[in-house]
């Protein structure tokens, strides 16, 4: 509990800005769309809701809740397979897997998937053992929500289907239950499919454009880079078990069905990404696998003889305590001193509060109307928007299609505020039309903002331009 509280509080206290994925998700969720140009919508809806309820700390609370819920599902599954003490240890030792610690300071679609993966696996285990209608219906809803969170959940769904077909559980497909669950999952996912159709498959077009912009010569060696990253992710867990002489490969303590289930569901999805990368020679992002490994600790603890486990519990907890203390200390030090050590700000070191205050003060000295939207440099725009008292909409500079809630008519009626780093003005949708509009008053200027986290760095110089409807101008 103390660990989770620290990881909720320390980023709020020690960082001066959000990491990239947090303000991006918040501004998406602010618009309550059925989809966005990078991802499906569910994660952003939840993130924005926590931001509205809990304020600036909301994303950090949500992220740790996702990790904690993942641990709960691992415990529930483990308690069906091993003793309850072992299940508890297996659950808390998920925190000895790197992906479930450091990356969680940045809530994103990977973190959002973690409890969904663990929950789906647990529900599937219950289905295999009880085959009730209620379980299949819950599975369908959660699978649909998973697909609304990130498309990579399809790897888990594929693994579940494959496992059922390769084992005696294939008889389940002879009943109506899995087919109804499939239809229910598609029903939950269908609003996003309709949105994709209406927006010319925007998300897939974005993914394609990103892949075309990168060099993708066939290179099977990138698969081993991915594999090495995954193995290194388990090092804290493996080291703790080795130091306590608790790393065993004894498969006699599990019945065959449970053993097959654990190993397949716990390892195959991550290995599947390796196989795809090896065959296609494409670079799989390491973090795509982050929700896939929640059962690894349960697998390893299930192999420990009960007598050995009973003798080593205290040492195991001590090892975990050392690891969690160390990673928490490193996290806090990085947030507080990282920019000074590197002489370069990370995304967490930007003067978000000052940027936001400058925008608000500047706008309200010129306009009597609320600031409806902000645009310009994407990073600066989302930083400013997500720290304001009344959050405005954000319009991406990249393409009109990336911000379908913004139209020329809205901009002409409400105006806009544009900001960018000096000398780096991006191409901004509709800007040329706004500059010709006689009903808008155009003001511009420049700010110089110090880097509190990197005091020796030259100040951040921001240029801005405001388009204010004439009926809103201060007299």
Residue ranges and their predicted role:
Residues 157-258, 269-275, 279:
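Transmembrane-lumen/periplasm boundary regions of multi-pass, lipid-linked membrane glycan transferases
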Residues 90-96, 143, 147:
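Short helix- or helix-capping micro-motifs
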Residues 120-135:
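Membrane-interface transmembrane helices that cradle and orient dolichyl/undecaprenyl
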Residues 102-113:
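Short acidic/glycine- and proline-prone juxtamembrane loop motifs at membrane-interface regions
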Residues 10-25, 34-49, 53-58, 65, ...:
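Extracytoplasmic catalytic/substrate-binding loops of multi-pass membrane glycan-assembly enzymes
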Residues 57, 61-85, 118-123:
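Transmembrane-helix motifs of polytopic, lipid-linked glycan transferases
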Residues 281-282, 286, 311-370, 377-395, ...:
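Membrane-proximal, lumen/periplasm-facing interface regions of secretory-pathway glyco-
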Residues 31-32, 260, 267, 281-312, ...:
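Hydrophobic/aromatic-rich transmembrane helices and adjacent perimembrane loops
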